[in-house]
Amino acid sequence: MTSTVVNCVKNLRLAKGWTQEELAQTTGVSRQSINSIERNRYVPSLELALKFAQVFGCGTDEIFKLESER
């Protein structure tokens, strides 16, 4: 059994009315990185996950979840 990390970054970003570029500037990464994270093509570092939690005002467990695959 394997696990996949899924996230709510796009939903949280849209709820704040931010563009990918605005979130990228706020967190110090490129817009392309934000795009890759939102599309589940890239799992961010712990440091970036904590930055997301800080800017969104929630815990990392509310942003990132493990989904089990069989």
Predicted regions and their residues:
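Alpha-helical residues within the helix-turn-helix
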Residues: 14, 25, 54
